Amino acid sequence: TLALIGSPVAHAIEPRYLLAIGLLLIAIGAGGIKPCVSTNVGDQFGETNRHLLTRVFNWFYFSINAGSFASTLLIPWLLDPYKAELGGFIAKLPPAIVGFLESPRLHSPDVAFGLPGVFMAIATIIFWMGRKKFVHIPPVGLRTYAREIFNKETGKIILNILIPVPFIAIFWALWQQNFSSWIVQAESMDRHLFGIEWLSSQIQTVNPIFILIMLPLFSYWLYPFVERFVRLTPLRKIGAGLFVTAASFFLVAIIQTQIDGGARPSIIWQVWAFVILTAGETLVSPTHLEFSYTQGPVKLKSLIMCTYLFAISLGNQFTAAVNFFIQNPDGSVKLQGASYFMFFVWVMLGTAVLFAIVTPFYKGRTYLQDQTQVAADAEPAVGFAVQPEA
């Protein structure tokens, strides 16, 4: 649908309606796919290999960011007109290739948004072809599902799992701003880096790059090292990530102070802020996926995984509410420049401190698929619980 914005169809339907339809379909697709995909990942593990869950969710998040890296680098390039620099590597290629890369037809919304759709279709086909290679947990049926949801004990479990969500939502309120306020800030910075003038929207490409580096680094080195001295539970990782995220916004606030003073700092400073932000993301995001999966009752895994998306949604709503309430009637804003970023620093610090106070009282249980059921791959999983790990 988004690809049609640059096509003749846009003359018959207003682009804003096409955009709204495309976003609605993305929301429906993401809401259906994401909780089920992450649940399917966890369902491959039972009691005998439960120690691998942390790493597998890290690798799952790794694969997500590999796609994010490709899209954030490629889509802005496909949306903008392109002209090869004289004397550059591209200009030295055969004329036919240069002509193709510079073609206005290539650099258009229908290609920029249509190409990911093609890749999504290919991925769907490959996934379907490999459906017999992984464990399936059969649906329990509507009656059983309803009985589980409206069970008093299940209600207590769900409410318990929701405790960290508001805190993690504030993390997402900050993190998502690398797509908005950080891009606006980059417009006022010197974006020459490695001999290239980067688009302000391309700087965020470093985030998935750093994620691809940090996920295995944290999983195979940092976490085992810290475990020698401190028991590193999921909630402790998340708490540490909240403090780290506040530090990233503090650096961005310092950068903005320089900009407000008339300076034009190098974009490398924002890259360093991305290093810190990505470290916080590595601690919080895949850990929340793992936490949500392990704490959810076996018949409600996909539903519980929705709490991950719920936290992201709450974070976006919080930022939108802040941006609404800081508006003055005359069009000015109460928070601008460095003060805007410092507001989020203090909010994040307060959230992190409160999280550290609340979470020691969290009493959870780890629920995994019954190993015999996973091996048989036949009956609805009955599951079992082991003692608290969160």
Question: Where does each model-flagged region fall?
Answer:
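A gly/Pro-rich, aromatic-decorated transmembrane alpha-helix motif that marks the paired
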Residues: 5-8, 66-81, 85-89, 250-253, ...
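Transmembrane alpha-helical cores of Major Facilitator Superfamily
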Residues: 58-66, 205, 209, 243, ...
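Intracellular juxtamembrane helix-capping segments at the cytosolic ends
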Residues: 32-47, 274, 281-296
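Conserved glycine-rich helix-kink/hinge and helix-boundary motifs of the Major Facilitator Superfamily
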Residues: 54-59, 198-201, 239, 271, ...
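Helical-face signature of the major facilitator-like transporter fold
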Residues: 23-28, 168, 172, 208, ...
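Intracellular loop-helix junctions on the cytosolic face of multi-pass helical membrane proteins
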Residues: 45-54, 58, 63, 75-205, ...
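C-terminal ends and interior cores of transmembrane alpha-helices
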Residues: 1-19, 240-262
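Hydrophobic or amphipathic alpha-helical targeting/insertion segments
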Residues: 1-36, 40-44, 78-83, 108-130
